[in-house]
Amino acid sequence: MAQFTRMETLNAIYEGGIVPVFYNADVEVAKQIVDAITAAGGRIAEFTNRGDFAIEVFAELVKYARDTHPRMIMGIGSVIDAPTAAMYIANGANFVVGPTLNAEAAETCNRRKVPYSPGCGSATEIQQAHELGVEIVKLFPGGQVGGPAFVKAVKGPSPWVSIMPTGGVDATEESITAWIQAGAVALGIGSKLVSKDLVAAGDFDAIRDKVKDCLWWVKKARGESLFVSIEHPGIYPTKDGGGQEVAEWYAQTFGFDMKVGNSTIFISGDGKGRLEIAKEPTADKAHVCVLVHNFEQAVADLEARGIELEEATVKPALKAAYLKAADPAGYRVHLLWNPSVT
């Protein structure tokens, strides 16, 4: 059964705006693709029902994602009928996508509160999908149906329509910007994003980087800021070994979680934002962390304005760099790209 509620899945699709679409008969390769999507900050992945024993690969992939990437929302694509939809839902599909509109498949998904996105190629089919309870309609094949101009035309008289083009969407800033600014709420991208050449070469880092770029281009096209928010302040205790006491006070007083590191302790609650507490009195470590949507773009933006940064710390799922100059109050400031807290 689905791990996430219907609303959780739909909100994640709306928020991220990119649905990577892929198929691979080798479950170990499929796992590495999911790893790459997750490392890029993606929370949605659509595995397609396109090969023999695809259901077995999908079931193993869902189990892997739940254990390794608990925030990853796995769905199934290329579903054309109700029995297939039911089979995949029973094996953990959180959403179902099809190339065509099928009323019985819609009813099956509705019974289990699983989002269904059927392929539609006309305003009439989109209306029929809405009457069947579809929230996000898949425009397929997007390029052949009419491209971004079709989305804009449909949303004129029907601004409430949520359209996810698939087919004809390139993993480029130009293509993504055109679709999003035309009114698409999300984009399904298959071989242009998870390309056969990169998979065959085992270059999953390149897939990760492409997904990361696409996620940023969606946000940029929506007019979202490159700099997200103040992610956390870094404070220090006034006495030796006092960091633990301070952290425990926050945890006990407010019921927050503690994550103990080598030299600092992070405090966090259910919402976004954290507090970093140094274990020892280190005034020079007091700082402010600024969360960014895209690390490379953020660095380039600051440098273009004459703001220098120190050498970056780069890990698969984390990038950070301190500004060389402190803020007017004397606090150090560092950028942070970290999908787990974005």
Label the model's feature ranges:
Residues 202, 208, 224-226, 230-240, 279-342:
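Vicinal oxygen chelate
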Residues 81-91, 124-132, 170-187:
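Catalytic cores of alpha/beta
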Residues 98-105, 138-147, 183-204:
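Glycine-rich phosphate-binding active-site loops on the catalytic face of alpha/beta enzymes
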Residues 1-83, 87-91, 181, 201-219, ...:
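Conserved N-terminal beta1-alpha1 strand-loop-helix module at the mouth
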Residues 254-286, 323-339:
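Conserved short beta-strand elements that form part of the metal-binding/catalytic scaffold
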Residues 9-23, 215-247, 285-288, 336-342:
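N-terminal beta-strand motif that seeds the catalytic metal site of vicinal oxygen chelate
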Residues 33, 50-52, 234-274:
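Core segments of cupin and vicinal oxygen chelate
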